[in-house]
Curated annotation (Swiss-Prot):
Family the UniProt entry places it in: Belongs to the MinE family.
NCBIfam families (UniProt xref): minE (TIGR01215), PRK00296.1 (NF001422)
Source lineage: Bacteria, Pseudomonadati, Pseudomonadota, Alphaproteobacteria, Hyphomicrobiales
Entry keyword annotation includes Nucleotide-binding: no
Top-rank lineage group of the source organism: Bacteria
Family annotation (InterPro entries): MinE, MinE_sf
One Pfam family from the record: MinE
Protein name per its UniProtKB record: Cell division topological specificity factor
Gene label: minE
Record HAMAP family: MinE
Organism of provenance: Methylorubrum extorquens (strain CM4 / NCIMB 13688)
An individual GO BP term: cell division
Length: 95
């Protein structure tokens, strides 16, 4: 990773992926935390809401635990006439 790549703002997808990985790793340590699905659902909804309007009750999240592996399933029902929100211009800090 170069210095320029490090300073470049990251996309919401990579941030969401990192958050999910951290949450899943944390869940494996605490094993059985009841509010994990709620936390995951809210994080995922917040990322999606930046791009498309989705009804909160149309998002289903399943966490299945196996031997040494957890699987996260996400089902999102998008309306046929879904409108993609315009990207907001990133604010740049003056160094």
């Amino acid at each position: 990773m170069s210095v320029l790549t490090f300073l470049k703002p990251r996309g919401s997808g990579s941030v969401a992926r990192e958050r999910l990985q951290l949450i899943l790793a944390h869940e494996r340590v605490e094993n059985g935390r009841p509010d994990l699905i709620i936390t995951l659902r809210e994080e995922i909804l917040n990322v999606i809401a930046k791009h498309v309007t989705v009804e909160r009750d149309k998002v289903q999240i399943k966490l299945e635990r196996g031997e040494g592996v957890s699987t996260l399933g996400v089902d999102i029902e998008f309306p046929v006439d879904a409108v993609i929100k315009p990207k907001a211009k990133a604010k740049r800090a003056i160094a």
